[in-house]
């Protein structure tokens, strides 16, 4: 176990955890659903944080050595390798601050590890000052939700196309089966069952 502290005091963090004290507080305070974040949302968080790190390096705000390690950490998040490091309950109050801080801590601790430094060495790479540089929760969470929705939309489009194909096949299968049509809750002219699809 390693020890991390915040304004409320000190907590022990499991040695294998990339998350830190803010995530532990969220786990203590928000045990509501028993679920964790959707993997696609975690991926979107990694993408948004990677874009921020790249932009901050490009404009000279973020040291390249630290920034490149953070980008590599974001790539690990995007790939799904670190999904188990996001234990925060989806229902956690506020505007997603716990998700944002969970992500910041994972990025920092993975980047610290990449650079050969111990996890929790926030004087070197800080969740607030480095991983959250030029951002706020109100930037990160809505943007990540939109990115996640776009990725989900791709899956939805494929599913809807498959559904339309199924309807076409059923329409063809039942094109010769007659039935009574209905309109205004009354029987109407005969139609084929295939036309229902």
Q: What would you call each of these model-derived segments?
A:
Residues 1-197:
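Conserved, well-structured ligand/cofactor-binding cores
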